[in-house]
């Protein structure tokens, strides 16, 4: 990942370009109320607010929320925009009622450009950056604590599952060996361990893949997404759309499978012998295949390269 170009002046100041914005606007064109579960810099939300849509923006990162509130203060003061500090996987804990419903719900998963560009947050493998990677204050451990305490077998499984790393066992063994001499504290420590296993020709793509795997574990991202999907589905109004942008194959697989299951003619549990759902699907998948960014957008915003957008409509 690299910093992306600033937004044009027509988008409320200088901010990073939101990914797949035109596609999101098209899919949620009929929405009058939107829940932005990953508010970040507020780029997607700003576009909805400019159209007169009422938006509730959620983010687990206090800094991101504060920046978005400053950017969108005019809309917040008018009552059109509401900002909530929360993890989208635990909205009830933030005071959301089970009756809160939305015409559109958006998730833009992964790290925001603001988080990545701030080296002090520890999401980057820049020289000297701390091993933090926490998206919010609700994470139990930062990346350094995780790498310094996790069992070697569990670390190997983590790297295999989240980074598709064929040398996961060897890399886990190298990390454990190094931390016994000196605890991991900065990005350099992890980069050196990766190079020791993958060789001197390893580079940014390898580092990004391993760092992403550690970040996913620190923030419990895949488990959180899996828990959140049915809960967010149930917050849609009839005909409402759930749109999700993912950047990791594990995320995309969870979303694809959930949308497929919800669109099936029978949604009863597999071990239930008698159908009680009356053979009616919960809704339909709008995107038969994931939507990717155009080459033009990728040229303007490199973060869009790995983005995959899927959308589902409630019955």
Curated annotation (Swiss-Prot):
One of its GO terms (cellular component) is cytoplasm. It comes from the Bacteria. Gene3D superfamilies: Putative methyltransferase TM0872, insert domain (1.10.150.170), Vaccinia Virus protein VP39 (3.40.50.150). It catalyses: cytidine(1402) in 16S rRNA + S-adenosyl-L-methionine = N(4)-methylcytidine(1402) in 16S rRNA + S-adenosyl-L-homocysteine + H(+). S-adenosyl-L-methionine binds at residues 42-44, 59, 96, 108, 115. Its EC number is 2.1.1.199. Pfam families: Methyltransf_5 (PF01795). GO terms for molecular function: rRNA (cytosine-N4-)-methyltransferase activity. InterPro entries: RsmH, SAM-dep_MeTrfase_MraW_recog, SAM-dependent_MTases_sf. It is found in: Cytoplasm. One of its GO terms (biological process) is rRNA base methylation. Keywords: Cytoplasm, Methyltransferase, rRNA processing, S-adenosyl-L-methionine, Transferase. The keyword S-adenosyl-L-methionine applies. Belongs to the methyltransferase superfamily. RsmH family. PANTHER family: 12S RRNA N4-METHYLCYTIDINE METHYLTRANSFERASE, S-ADENOSYL-METHYLTRANSFERASE MRAW. Specifically methylates the N4 position of cytidine in position 1402 (C1402) of 16S rRNA. This is Ribosomal RNA small subunit methyltransferase H. It comes from Gemmatimonas aurantiaca (strain DSM 14586 / JCM 11422 / NBRC 100505 / T-27).
């Amino acid at each position: 990942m690299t910093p992306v170009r600033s937004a044009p002046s027509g988008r409320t100041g200088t901010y990073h370009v939101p990914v797949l914005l035109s596609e999101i606007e098209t899919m949620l064109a009929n929405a009058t109320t939107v829940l932005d579960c990953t508010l970040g810099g507020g780029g997607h939300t700003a576009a909805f607010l400019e159209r007169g849509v009422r938006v509730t923006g959620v983010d687990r990162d206090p800094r991101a929320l504060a920046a978005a509130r400053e950017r969108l203060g005019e809309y917040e003061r008018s009552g059109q925009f509401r900002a909530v500090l929360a993890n989208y996987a635990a909205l009830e804990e933030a005071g959301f009622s089970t009756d809160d419903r939305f015409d559109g719900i958006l998730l833009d998963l992964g790290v925001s450009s603001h988080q990545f560009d701030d080296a002090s947050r520890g999401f980057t493998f820049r020289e000297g950056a701390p091993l933090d990677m926490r998206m919010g204050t609700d994470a139990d451990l930062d990346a350094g604590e995780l790498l310094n305490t996790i069992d070697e077998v569990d670390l190997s499984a983590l790297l295999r599952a989240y980074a598709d790393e064929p040398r996961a066992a060897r890399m886990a063994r190298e990390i454990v060996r190094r931390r016994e001499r000196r605890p991991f504290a900065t990005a350099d420590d992890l980069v050196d361990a990766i190079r020791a296993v993958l060789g001197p020709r390893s580079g940014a793509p390898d580092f990004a893949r391993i760092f992403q795997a550690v970040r996913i574990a620190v923030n419990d991202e895949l488990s959180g997404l899996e828990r959140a999907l049915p809960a967010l589905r149930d917050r849609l109004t009839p005909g409402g759309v759930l749109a999700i942008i993912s950047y990791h194959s594990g995320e995309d697989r969870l979303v694809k499978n959930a949308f497929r299951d919800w669109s099936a003619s029978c949604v009863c549990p597999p071990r239930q012998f008698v159908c009680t759902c009356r053979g009616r699907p919960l809704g339909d998948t709008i995107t038969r295949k994931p939507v990717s960014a155009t080459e033009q957008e990728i040229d303007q915003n490199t973060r869009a390269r790995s983005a995959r957008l899927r959308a589902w409509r409630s019955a």
